[in-house]
């Protein structure tokens, strides 16, 4: 990971120069400071910090999970899930905190007095999202390639060539496999979702500056940040439902998603009264979309519940408890070719409902509030991100714990 971040740091430095020349230079007659480039560097640095924090959390929690599972499986589950929770709340909390500090700093430096200057302020801040996405590209794609290369390489060397079990201490590739889980599924996934959150929030902030009503009602511009903060609060309340002692881990994790979605749906209602009473009045392509408070609420809810549906559909097609994977396992009895054909067909089929969910969400949101509605829907889809990250972090931590147990020859 040190090598990855070194290469990434060099790339970000070069890209920052491009941002300076392409974006900040035209503003030099008005603003002497490279605001967009600075926001880009802050976004990239925050994303890398989130990835590092995730790696530290995963490596601290995995061996503790192994030890506690040897005593009581429920205690091991608690440690693994709490590790995921720390990762989730750190990432979303840092993303929101640094973005708010950046906005306040730029506001104090620029002192915007009219709509045009406010628009410039948030255009400068948009570099924050670009920085997060740049790191996400390396973390998700580069980390994912390393993860799969280490996984397949360890399996080929161990199970195929040497005929030894998976995660056997006799196979040195096992260590690379476990490290790969952290690099791709912790650091890479965290950077990816950080970039998505930063981009969608910055997009909503920029679009909101096209509304004179929202600029006059100053608090209304920060409505996207309020929605993200409500998501953190809803996820914090929801985490207490995870520690009901049960052997049904999958059910417990699904309850987390359901409860956080329902809570956030209710908690957003008081927040919509921050928006102008007469409507947001978003300008797009020469037309004004005067969406009401409740229409903005519908946009957020569409994104929120679409995200839940997509997660549940993904779980249905990939869980070993459900029909699709069982049918795929039966196809494996007839050879590798039926396995590949059925697996590919199953992957295609699993995308149908998510595509329709996304299409309907974008279409309805755009009809209600133009691009502002689409941005709010994206923020809504990421509303329960702390819980989603908790569940995503739980996977690699528990997987690493299983690998450590196998290498240590612990009892099942």
Where are these regions (language model features)?
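Hydrophobic packing and interface segments
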Residues: 1-412
């Amino acid at each position: 990971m040190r090598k990855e971040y070194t290469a990434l740091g060099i790339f970000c430095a070069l890209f920052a120069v491009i941002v300076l020349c392409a974006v900040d230079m035209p503003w030099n007659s008005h603003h002497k400071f490279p605001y967009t480039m600075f926001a880009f560097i802050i976004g990239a640095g925050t994303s890398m910090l989130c990835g590092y924090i995730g790696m530290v959390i995963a490596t601290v929690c995995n061996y503790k999970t192994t030890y506690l599972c040897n005593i009581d499986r429920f205690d091991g589950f608690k440690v693994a899930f709490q590790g995921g929770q720390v990762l989730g709340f750190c990432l979303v909390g840092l993303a929101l905190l640094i973005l708010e500090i950046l906005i306040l700093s730029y506001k104090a430096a620029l002192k915007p007095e009219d709509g045009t200057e406010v628009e410039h302020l948030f255009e400068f801040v948009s570099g924050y999202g670009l920085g997060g996405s740049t790191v996400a590209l390396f973390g998700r794609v580069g980390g994912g390639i390393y993860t799969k290369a280490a996984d397949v390489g360890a399996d080929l060397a161990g199970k195929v060539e040497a005929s030894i079990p998976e995660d056997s201490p006799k196979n040195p590739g096992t260590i690379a496999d476990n490290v790969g889980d952290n690099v791709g599924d912790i650091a890479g996934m965290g950077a990816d979702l950080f970039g998505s959150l930063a981009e969608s929030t910055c997009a909503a902030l920029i679009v909101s500056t096209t509304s004179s009503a929202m600029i006059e009602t100053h608090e209304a511009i920060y409505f996207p940040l309020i929605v993200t903060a409500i998501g953190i609060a809803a996820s914090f309340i929801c985490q207490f439902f995870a520690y009901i002692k049960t052997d049904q881990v999958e059910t417990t994790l699904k309850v987390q998603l359901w409860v956080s979605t329902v809570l956030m749906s209710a908690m957003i209602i008081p927040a919509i009264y921050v928006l102008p009473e007469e409507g947001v009045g978003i300008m797009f392509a020469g037309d004004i979309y005067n969406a009401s408070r409740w229409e903005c609420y519908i946009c957020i809810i569409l994104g929120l519940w679409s995200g839940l549906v997509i997660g549940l559909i993904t779980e249905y097609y990939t869980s070993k408890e459900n029909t699709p994977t069982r049918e795929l396992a039966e196809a494996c009895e007839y050879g590798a070719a039926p396995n590949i054909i059925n697996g590919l067909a199953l992957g295609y089929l699993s995308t149908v409902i998510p595509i329709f969910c996304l299409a309907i969400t974008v279409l309805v949101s755009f009809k209600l509030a133009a691009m502002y509605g689409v941005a709010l829907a994206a923020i809504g889809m990421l509303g329960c991100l702390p819980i989603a990250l908790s569940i995503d972090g739980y996977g690699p931590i528990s997987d690493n714990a299983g690998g450590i147990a196998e290498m240590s020859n612990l009892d099942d």
